[in-house]
Amino acid sequence: MAGGKQFTFSYENEVCKQDYFIKSPPSQLFSSVTSWKKRFFILSKAGEKSFSLSYYKDHHHRGSIEIDQNSSVEVGISSQEKMQSVQKMFKCHPDEVMSIRTTNREYFLIGHDREKIKDWVSFMSSFRQDIKATQQNTEEELSLGNKRTLFYSSPLLGPSSTSEAVGSSSPRNGLQDKHLMEQSSPGFRQTHLQDLSEATQDVKEENHYLTPRSVLLELDNIIASSDSGESIETDGPDQVSGRIECHYEPMESYFFKETSHESVDSSKEEPQTLPETQDGDLHLQEQGSGIDWCLSPADVEAQTTNDQKGNIPDESQVEKLNVFLSPPDVINYLALTEATGRICVSQWEGPPRLGCIFCHGDHLLAVNDLKPQSLEEVSLFLTRSIQKEDSFRILSYQVAFGEGTELRDRAPGFRTSDRHDVAKRACMESDWCRDSKTAPSTNLCLSFLFCKIMTNDGAGCWIIK
């Protein structure tokens, strides 16, 4: 995009806007300047009720931000503290920052162009307002449709009955007729109220849709009677409505028939089959989210919380260990990567003398008591440690072992005074420490976070949190 020119496309191409912005990292890395990345953003229409703001790096898709009627877009940052931090890091004006708040996260985009930021915010805000207005109109139409009583007149009833049915649906004519009937018949009001109460009760009791039943046969009977010379009475609105109701039958019979058949079929199938529900969309959502129908609301909430935490039962099973390695071992055998805002172990190819110290996904907490925020800082800490030849002592602390776990077999040099006791004093030592040799001056201390969970078959295993 040369010269900072902005390209705008129509909805037919699905792409509405595109430009470069500096995107904010997750909240835990907000203060890290290196975590803010420049990305190419493309704003496209994802259906009739949402936008998709995708961002790319070197033509590779890195993620997307879903913007719907529940999202909010504004110029600047509402939090004064965050706004000051952004100004300090990037030397930008508040009008050059765009805030996008979604259901799951809050994003901040820096563009260094006030007009461009204002244009993007105005475009997305107007789209959200159109969605809300359309949704309100739809809800009003549905509410009016539920309150309105529709009458159906057969073309075989003649023009007089049709005109009466249409006239009764007109508000002005209906009010005039009602006023005249009240004056001529004193008992009209009581009868009318009874009819309304009975109709309301019928609607509450019969809340299923009605299906057509033998309409053609009914029409044939009417035609036959007209051919034989019998006169067709002109019906009022109530009589027309009653006649139409006789052409339909309730769905309750079909519903219970299908339910009985489904119960018989389900009894023949495996017991693990989920029961059929009347609301298919809700059933698919519950099944897709992995929620069991037999769980109580409290159990469902607890299960959802465990899923969000990565299947970690509680914090008491989280262990912090200190691992001591020489700089050559770290450089040659250990590979790290960034995932979900954390620094994790992607590969460990240590020799047999070191053993399987790390597992894929272990979370790096600190390097020589320094907490890195990115891979660049890890490399910086390791480089400085090698150049200064810092010496590190071997640390020992309380480590709680779950019953049946054998962590000491996974990491060489890990000992406990009693393998069956819980929360015993433990020490993480390397081979040269057990041989009573002097510790080298360039050993590195890497702190990792482990946790224990139970798999579905009940076997204990160690994974990263």
UniProtKB/Swiss-Prot annotation:
It holds the Pfam family PH. SMART domains: PH (SM00233). It comes from the Eukaryota. Gene3D superfamilies: Pleckstrin-homology domain (PH domain)/Phosphotyrosine-binding domain (PTB) (2.30.29.30). Residues 159-173 have a biased composition (Polar residues). Residues 14-129 form the PH domain. Residues 159-179, 258-283 are annotated as: Disordered. SUPFAM superfamilies: PH domain-like. Residues 258-271 have a biased composition (Basic and acidic residues). This is Pleckstrin homology domain-containing family S member 1.
